[in-house]
Amino acid sequence: MNRRNFMKLSSAALSSALITNPLDLLGMPMNTPGFTKADFGPDFKWGIAASAYQIEGAWNEDGKGPSIWDTFTHNKPHKIRNKHNSDMSYDFYHNYKEDIAMIKKLNFEVFRFSFSWSRIFPEGIGRVNQKGIDFYHRVIDRCLELGVEPWALMYHFDLPQALEDKGGWANRDVINWFDEYTHKVTTEYGDKVKTWFGQNEPIGFTLGGYLAMYHAPGYFAPQKFLKAIHHALMCQAS
């Protein structure tokens, strides 16, 4: 089955689930017959969440630099089930218009996406990749065009490899690197995006990446882990 057919079938199935039984999507029991979306109240936001590495593909296109997950999956494929990687993934980079239209068709109100740090800063800091900047403008504009609220996450596990080569999250300089990166994206898109998130699960990318070895960069380094989690929290505070 090709990507388009899979996405269409998935969308149809999910749409049906939303209409008839929304809590099934969360794996929760339904105890109230007739429970509907409206019962959550007018202020509850229904949305879709995704991360750059998981959906974008185009891992080395249009000036993007490698992330630690590119390196991890290429150099340690045995760490990944079936040796998969996200070099192409869902190819959101080339199909974002259609994919966001599917979100709208499913009657979701919000699309929470993440920026690829190394698509915007190929070396992590310094030089800005204008093609990366332009891509996220197109994504955000497509959301606004269709009435889908864009929520932006600044970091979802995919540190630029150039910064990992300098010590990554275990290097205290990451606080300044993160500040430079987040300042750029918030000033660039702040007039369009009103809801922002700093990091996805800091314990996940620090513990998994620097101690448990199941996330990029895949180290067993207790001292690095302790520094990394401290620096990640410092970045949140900054």
What do the predicted segments below correspond to?
Residues 33-74, 123-124, 137-238:
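Active-site region of glycoside hydrolase catalytic domains
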Residues 66-101:
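Aromatic- and Gly/Pro-rich amphipathic surface segment
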Residues 5-27:
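N-terminal export signals
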Residues 28-32:
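Short gly/ser/thr-rich secondary-structure transition/capping motifs
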Residues 77-87, 116-121, 217-220:
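Short glycine/proline-rich turn/loop motifs
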Residues 87-97, 126-135, 172-180:
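Glycine-rich anion/phosphate-binding loops
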